[in-house]
């Protein structure tokens, strides 16, 4: 079973937070092949390889891993959903919608959105908005949860019900 962790990781908190989420998932599922884009040095060692890391190289490396995964965990926090994360959600769900539209069966897959911001339950000025098209895509093929524990529970249920 393969999973893909889509997050923003270009600042200290994003990088360290992503590493902590990945660690929790790996502890819960040691047999799972978890791809975390920030760990792919071939496309992310910008200090030493910035001149050879291209947008196409990043796209090919990450898209290959994304499309071969059965589980997408998408981190949704931030003022906006990170553009890369939204693109990864779109590609993953789009591949499923295409197979569905042409009547082809596919390996079961799930999208789990992780949205931890406490303001999501606020009202008025205290409410945090997320794009409803993106949330709808997630909810059509999975759901949005608020904690890493809930992510792990959903992953456990999915892996139990759809072993590869």
Describe each PLM feature range:
Residues 1-164:
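Conserved catalytic or regulatory cores that recognize and/or transform ribose-phosphate-containing ligands
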